[in-house]
Amino acid sequence: MSGQESRTLGAWGEALAAAWIRKQGGRIIAANFRCRFGEIDLICEEKGYLCFTEVKLRKSTAYGSAGAFVDFRKQNKLRATAQYYLSRHSTTFQPRFDVIEVYAPYGLETKFPKITRIENAF
């Protein structure tokens, strides 16, 4: 898969995750928030939480779950990016780190991708 195809598939997965969050009653505050520390795919408010969400799309679980790809190094980058965000955006919501797994065996051709959320993932 080329870099462009991978980015397209990733953006599609993030759009699916955002729609899923909205369907669950959440409100998207920011998408693809970037700073010098890293990037957070989705930031949303939901049930008293400010959720910093990493979206992982995989075609299969052959090499492990999608959530398993959020390793310690990535977690540290997400924490630093979230701290930066919170230093510039005050909130009364409790911060939380989630991972949304999107499984799409046929890539963009998948009609019913499986979406799951790991709340308080780390």
For each of these PLM feature ranges, what is it?
Residues L42-T61, L78:
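Conserved catalytic cores of phosphodiester-cleaving nucleases, focusing on short active-site segments
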Residues A31-R34, Y103:
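Short, solvent-exposed loop/turn elements at beta->coil junctions and helix N-caps
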Residues I21, L78, F97:
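Residue-level signal for inorganic ion chemistry
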Residues K59-S87:
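Mg2+/Mn2+-dependent nuclease catalytic core
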Residues R36-G38:
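Short acidic/glycine-enriched loop/turn segments that link adjacent beta-strands
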Residues M1-A31:
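Acidic-basic catalytic patches of nuclease active cores, encompassing PD-(D/E)XK
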